[in-house]
A protein has these predicted regions:
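Class II aminoacyl-tRNA synthetase-like tRNA-binding/catalytic domains
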Residues: 1-57, 61-65, 247
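Metal-assisted phosphate- and nucleotidyl-transfer catalytic regions
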Residues: 1-4, 77-188, 211-233
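Active-site lining segments that contact anionic ligands and/or coordinate catalytic metals
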Residues: 11, 32-34, 55-57, 153-156, ...
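A residue-level signal for conserved active-site and pocket-lining positions in enzyme catalytic cores
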Residues: 16, 30, 60, 118, ...
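Short conserved micro-motifs at the rims of enzyme active sites and ligand-binding pockets
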Residues: 27-28, 47-50, 69-72, 169-172, ...
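His/Asp/Glu-rich mid-to-C-terminal helical/loop segments that flank catalytic regions of hydrolases
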Residues: 31, 35, 66-88
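A generic structural motif
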Residues: 59-70, 189-192
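Active-site pocket scaffolds in enzymes
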Residues: 196-197, 202-270
């Protein structure tokens, strides 16, 4: 959803990659599991503590999955295991940085709340009204994380089942209840990963692209759609923000403090 950086590329116009998602999807039919750690570039005009123009991402794609639950469980389990290892292997370092105490769910599963339920709980608890319910507000993200830590003993929580109006063209949709198979993994008040199930049916993909106003005959979509035409398995994955994970693990309040030479709307060098 972010804007792109454009550049000249041998007399052609290219853009810096926001995400390797399309490539992951093309690959997953052959490799079944795809992993990448790389920088992503987003021309977001946001001067906030949450955003940067250059971010380090862990991208995962899983093929032949049984459904969205499997994708959510895999990403959740990976995050729990990662945090356990960090807090075990680097206990002295974290103590010297005054990192918060780690709280993880006793049953080993990241708790889940639908986005509609979070809106309802937040409004009841705070008496605030959420105007745009397609997504969570930053205050809602902080509130549900505080609730999960206090009531469920978990620093991690999922917000799931986003409404159809929030869907991107590549999302698999649950038309029966008007939601999208899409979850956001939240950690100590901040989204650190987006975890959706992708649409893998060629005809539905073409229809959803047209609904989004995209030109399905554009050269840029040629090889992407070709993979769907040949056949892709049920698949899903995540884009996981490594900088944000570091920020919240240490207990910082600004993602730029967790990044060497951060890039934002005001900083290009060093």
């Amino acid at each position: 959803g972010a804007e792109v950086f454009k550049l000249d590329y041998f007399d052609k116009t290219a853009t810096l990659a926001q995400s390797p998602q399309f490539y992951k999807q093309i690959m997953v039919g052959a490799y079944e599991r795809v992993f990448e750690i790389a920088a992503a570039y987003r021309a977001e005009p946001s001067a906030t503590t949450r955003h940067m123009s250059e971010v380090m991402m862990l991208d995962i794609e899983m093929g032949f999955v049984s459904g969205h639950d499997e994708v959510l469980d895999t990403v959740g389990d990976m995050t729990i295991d990662t945090l356990n290892r960090i807090y075990t292997d680097h206990a002295d370092d974290l103590k010297s940085l005054n990192a918060p105490e780690l709280k993880l769910p006793s049953d080993g599963k990241v708790p889940r709340f639908t986005i509609a339920k979070i809106h309802e709980m937040y409004e009841a608890a705070t008496k605030n009204t959420v105007q745009d319910k397609k997504d969570l507000t930053p205050d809602e993200e902080k509130w549900i994380c505080e609730y999960a830590r206090k009531e469920l003993g978990s620093d991690l929580v999922y917000a799931t089942d986003f409404p159809l109006e929030a869907a991107k063209f590549y999302h698999k949709r649950n038309t029966e209840n008007g939601t999208v198979y899409w979850g956001d993994l939240l950690f100590r008040g901040l989204e650190i990963a987006t975890v959706p199930l992708r649409e893998n049916n060629y005809q539905k993909m073409v229809e959803q692209m047209k609904e989004a106003g995209l030109d399905v005959d554009h050269e840029g979509f040629k090889y992407y759609l070709q993979a769907f035409k040949y056949g892709l398995p049920e698949h899903g994955g995540c884009g996981f923000g490594i900088d944000r994970l570091v920020e919240k693990t240490i207990g910082l309040s600004n993602v730029k403090e967790a990044t060497l030479f951060p890039r934002d709307i005001n900083r290009l060098t060093p």
